[in-house]
Amino acid sequence: MTSRRPLKDHLFNHLFRYHYPSWDQILQELDTLSVATLNPDCHVPALNVEKTLYLAKTIQILVQHRQSEPYLVPAARANLAYSLQQLYKLGNDKIRGVINGMLPLVDAGCIGFERELIKGLPRVLTLQYPHTAPLESEPPTADCTEWCLSHFVGASGRLRSEVRDILTTHNGTCAPSFQWMASVVKKFFLVETVIYEDFQDTDFNVQLNLCFFWTAVVQMYQRCIYEQKLVHIISTSLTLLKSTARSFFAWYDLYRPNLGSAALVKYTEHLIRALTPDCSDVELGELCSHLHHCKHALFSIQ
């Protein structure tokens, strides 16, 4: 059974861990909210204000995610280029030749550069470890998580499991943030002292595995951007915010309780009506402040 809790206890963990959260996650968080009012008649309107405030804060964070969205693929691409450069230093002449065909495309961010990686990285693997069986170069779908994992070398089952979990969270309905992925990425590096009998070049393994990982990450983010996941979830959240707020304002217009300033309440209603899916986090920040006032005023009514 889900525990109910006040908004102040919410850490918005789903928004820290996911650049693209799922709608179900937001609804589950919303359903855990509760309030305690002195006047029982104020309980439902206060809860509606609490939910409106939660949705406003959620949208504010999602808008910030939208602002940083253009940097996701370039950041993953830069990490990919770094690992390719390290492989170039560690590999033999044949491996360098393959990397020379991929690295300029990654550096330039050429359209479709990830397709060349999907073809070229398995070649790097077999050139370094000729005893590895040839694997299917093309992932079966746009999601290349399993392709990525099938090419890992010298990686523990636990690391593979964590990578699968982070790249396929909630059956692909959401995508992780860079901050959350960092907690997994560091584990690639923390195996530098582990030697595998069949894959003995640990330094090489670390960088090659990271190349496979960042290729999958690029594919994941490109899919989210193409599907406009943030646009859809912001619009859906905003629709629910306005609907929830309307219930509160209808109650306020009917009973006219003293919330400190009737003009401020009406101004808050105006701000909510004016919100659009293209709103900024500045507008939402102001709205959150006024909703806090309404909430605490409702709490004090006897």
Curated annotation (Swiss-Prot):
It comes from the Viruses. InterPro entries: Herpes_BBRF1. This is Protein ORF49. It holds the Pfam family Herpes_BBRF1. Keywords: Viral latency, Viral reactivation from latency. Plays a role in the activation the host JNK/p38 pathways necessary for KSHV reactivation from latency and for viral replication. Induces transcriptional activation through host JUN of several ORF50-responsive promoters. GO terms for biological process: release from viral latency. Belongs to the herpesviridae BBRF1 family. The lineage of its organism: Viruses, Duplodnaviria, Heunggongvirae, Peploviricota, Herviviricetes.
